[in-house]
Amino acid sequence: MDDYVIRREGKAVFYAPNPKKYDIYSAPVFYNPAMEKNRTLSVLLLKVAGAQMGGGLTVCEPLSGTGIRGIRYVIESGVVGKLILNDLSKEAVHVIQKNLSINGVEADVYNEDANVLLHKLRGQCDVVDVDPFGSPAPFLSAAFRALKNEGIVCATATDTAVLVGRYPRKCLRRYGSVIRKSPFYLEMGLRNLVGYVARIAASEDFAIRPLLSYWEGHYFRTCVYAVKSAKDADDMLQRDVGYVEYRRYRKVTRRQSEYTSGPVWIGELGDPSIAFFMAREGQYSDFLKLLEEEYSVSLPWFYKLPEFAVDGKSPTLEEAMAALRRAGVYAARTHMASDGFKAEATYGEVERVLRRVT
């Protein structure tokens, strides 16, 4: 297998395409080493949330590639009772079986179209992790159908330019939304993804509650806890899906206009307590502590320091945060911009505070 090399990730060893022969696009089996953080955070999430669910979970990864994500779930989370791996590529299935063997992990392995498999698994899974190259949109309806009456659905989206509205027609066509230009466009892109997941969930009579959502360089990622209830789905759509208006100031609205982005998720992007317990595991703890603080701000946008510049000068992030807190405003840094912060205050309220320190 000179086309493959042995790699290590987390507590697993596995065969992956030889990077000296292939890039990630030409490799016979898909594996992206740049997604290690994604996989590690997913393991931590399943370890924390899966324990709360009682363990012994049936976990399905319908787009498995080398199988490393699912294998790490079993080895490192301690909550997987049954693992289901799948890939449309026969070569990938062969590699998955070898990787299961060298790690001593058992799994049901399929060579199916992802949607076909998920439909066959209707109502059987506690966790479905959709991690495609590109958009998760084609797989989400089937993912929720494969779920039991409650469980977790995770989705990765690498089509970030579409989600942030850089390609308006494709955004509308693929996600049914319009995203306007704004200083906080990355948060709108993330909320666009979560909002789409929520609307698809509702179409299958599920209500969702985000556990972990974030942006990382070239992708957005969200993991949501879903409960089957038509009434709760109706309530969720009414409460947590809407529009964000931007005309320097920001506001949440239920009406679409030339100034609004949406429909997007306007509720919490994640559970602060989940991020807290994940951080205690020690891996990516600084990032997770940042998310914990960020999730505690309810307003669905962030501010950037240059918005409050006077004569071309703006306060440092530390000065701005300290001033807001002295004024009794809860504020937190955002992981989506080095000069950005979230605050439980309107643009005008933030402006009045920061003008005193510029």
UniProtKB/Swiss-Prot annotation:
SUPFAM superfamilies, alphabetized:
S-adenosyl-L-methionine-dependent methyltransferases (SSF53335)
Q: Name one GO biological process term.
A: tRNA N2-guanine methylation
Position of the signal peptide: none
Presence of keyword tRNA processing: yes
Which of UniProt's keywords are assigned here?
Methyltransferase, RNA-binding, S-adenosyl-L-methionine, Transferase, tRNA processing, tRNA-binding
The UniProt record lists the EC number as 2.1.1.216
Query: What's the protein called, per UniProt?
Result: tRNA (guanine(26)-N(2))-dimethyltransferase
Would I find Methyltransferase among this entry's keywords?
A: yes
All copies of the Trm1 methyltransferase domain together span: 5-354
Question: What is the role of this chain?
Answer: Dimethylates a single guanine residue at position 26 of a number of tRNAs using S-adenosyl-L-methionine as donor of the methyl groups.
Positions of S-adenosyl-L-methionine binding:
R39, R69, D87, D113, A114
Q: Name one GO molecular function term.
A: tRNA (guanine(26)-N2)-dimethyltransferase activity
The Swiss-Prot or TrEMBL record describes its family as follows: Belongs to the class I-like SAM-binding methyltransferase superfamily. Trm1 family.
Q: What class of enzyme is it?
A: transferase
The record lists the catalysed reaction(s) as: guanosine(26) in tRNA + 2 S-adenosyl-L-methionine = N(2)-dimethylguanosine(26) in tRNA + 2 S-adenosyl-L-homocysteine + 2 H(+)
